[in-house]
Amino acid sequence: GCKLTFWKCKNKKECCGWNACALGICMPR
């Protein structure tokens, strides 16, 4: 699956939909 907004991440491919990985957290663009 994918990681939701505000979940910890290492890269943007881990995050759901349009979310980007910023500062180690999935953030909406």
UniProtKB/Swiss-Prot annotation:
GO terms for molecular function: sodium channel inhibitor activity; toxin activity. Pfam families: Toxin_23 (PF08093). Disulfide bonds join C2-C16, C9-C21, C15-C26. It is found in: Secreted. One of its GO terms (cellular component) is extracellular region. Expressed by the venom gland. InterPro entries: Toxin_23. Keywords: Disulfide bond, Ion channel impairing toxin, Knottin, Neurotoxin, Secreted, Toxin, Voltage-gated sodium channel impairing toxin. Its main location: secreted. Belongs to the neurotoxin 15 family. 01 (magi-5) subfamily. The presence of a 'disulfide through disulfide knot' structurally defines this protein as a knottin. The primary structure of the mature toxin is identical to that of beta-hexatoxin-Mg1a (Magi-5) from Macrothele gigas (AC P83561). Insect and vertebrate active toxin. Binds at site 4 of mammalian voltage-gated sodium channels and shifts the activation voltage of the mammalian rNav1.2a (SCN2A) channel to more hyperpolarized voltages, whereas the insect channel, DmNav1 (para), is not affected. Causes temporary paralysis when injected into lepidopteran larvae at 8.6 nmol/g. A low intracranial injection dose into mice causes lacrimation, closure of the eyes and sweating. A high injection dose causes extensive lacrimation and death. This is Beta-hexatoxin-Mr1a. It comes from Macrothele raveni.
